[in-house]
Structure formats: structure tokens, C-alpha cells
């Protein structure tokens, strides 16, 4: 991926992401996960008074969530690598607001960074919703290969004119339905209130299945399930455990219908205020910690499901065919917004 000042040149490949896909592929997506260190809160070197550039970096996750862990690792690398000239301050648990609020904050200068889902960034670059299409990816290996390819690098270039500098694509999670009731087939969600993210694609997707989309931030899911504001939602297994959603949504249907990738994003206005040397430190740190984020998510998903089952979660392994038949027609509906059917087929056919 090209991350120079102008953003006008052809994208270059991120070596760290390509290496990760190759190594994960070689070991069935499992190589090296157990040895990933979980960093403590970053301690930045002291900067000269009045000289430090403040980089407020948001995270929706708690302190133990992969997004926050990797954000603190990013802070540590940047703070030390710039000798304190950049002071990265991490704000977990949505302290800076939801994704939409943080993205808007980047544009006005109140926030400088966050790993934002492509679904939310699709409000500014509709083509980014390409990677959110249901059943677009065959499996984890296919998804990771595509997101470390020129296809994803070219997408990153589209964000720069909109005010966002995309420096990596950590996986945010693999979505599965989580509910108060058993979900086996698409008809099971008809008439049910479904918590969605603030994405036109996600809202439309569940509307086509007869559900009633109800956009809510992650922090309101637990209460929404308790009070009946929503009946079900979809999310990653790691978040299901971390947020204790198993207490209010005892049924988890393994579906893997959407692979949610985030864009490691720095506000373009902040990026342009950095020296070339500082940009390199930030760019390299983003690459390293996007890799860390992905590794932790894949590791945590496996562990989280086991822990949730011990707490009473009932896991349903659904037949994917009826869901594919019900969901993939949205490809045609959103095709024009994501670059046309050729763009979709390019991803489907990608082999790495």
C-alpha cells in the first residue's frame, strides 16, 4: 500500500500482511498465535514541552479486547519510535463515541485514529462495502489473502481524498447470529428485532430476510437484549465472550456469513502534519499492530467459544446453503455501489 503524502501513486504491497497470510496458510491459520504477547498500557517517552503531537486513538473494545490491545501496542511503538514527538493516547470502551462519531471526529480534528469497520467507512466510500457482502469469502484463508492483495490496496487509495489514511486491514471478527431463540434457517428471524451496525448494507440485508433492523452501538446490545429492544444480533465470538452477551443471548449460530475487516485509519489532516520520518514510524507501527490485531482475533474466537459453551451457550451449526440463497441476491442490489459485479467476481475468484 502506498502511504506517501499525496496518495497519488499506485499502491504498494504491505510485506507484513503478505507474510502473515503466507504463514497462516502454511499452518491452517494457526501458526504462531499462542506466542502473541498482550502488551500492557503503553508508556510514552517524555516529549519536549509543547512539542508533542497528540494522536487520540479510539477503540470500541474493553481493555482486554484485541482492538484495544493492538492499539496500545501501536501507541508504544509510535511513542518510542518518535522519541515522544507523537503522543498516542488510547481511549477504549467507546470513550470517544461510536464508529460513526469517531470517523466524523477525524474529519474535524477532534480524533486522530481508530480501526474503523469498512461497513461504517462505506458511508464515505461506498465501494468499501464490497468486503462486507455476505458469503463473499470462502473461508478465513481466502478472506485474509484478499485483504492483503492489490484489490484491498487499491481500495485504500479511495479513502485519502475523503480525509482518511488507511494503513492496514486487521480482521475485526467473523460474524455469527446470536439470539434469545434458536436460529437455524432464514425464516427464523422474520419479524424479529435485529441489532445492526450503522451500515446501509447490513440494514438492507436483514430487511430482506424479514427482520426489523435496529441500529445500536455495541455498548447497548446487552441492555437492548434485556429490555426487549432487540431479539438478536450478529457479531464475533470474541466479543460475545468479552461483553458477556452469552448471558442475554444463549444461542449462537455458526454461520460466518460476513468477515468484518477494519481499516486501520489515521486522519489525513493529522497525517499531513507529520514529517516523512514520523509517517514511516506510524505506517510501520500500523502494519505490525494490524497483524497483531488479526492474530489475536483469530486466537480469541476459538477460546471464546469454548468458554461460552461452558457458561451454557447452545451452539447451532446451520446449513449454510439456505442462508447463501437468501443473502447473496444483495450482491446484485449493491453491485453498482461497490464497483459492479466484475469487482465482486474478482474477489470471489481471487486465489492469492
Task: Kindly label every feature range from the protein language model.
Residues 1-7:
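N-terminal acidic, proline/glycine-rich, low-complexity intrinsically disordered segments
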Residues 2, 13-142, 150-352:
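N-terminal secretory/targeting leader peptides
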Residues 145:
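Short beta-strand-centered segments that line the small-molecule binding cleft or hinge
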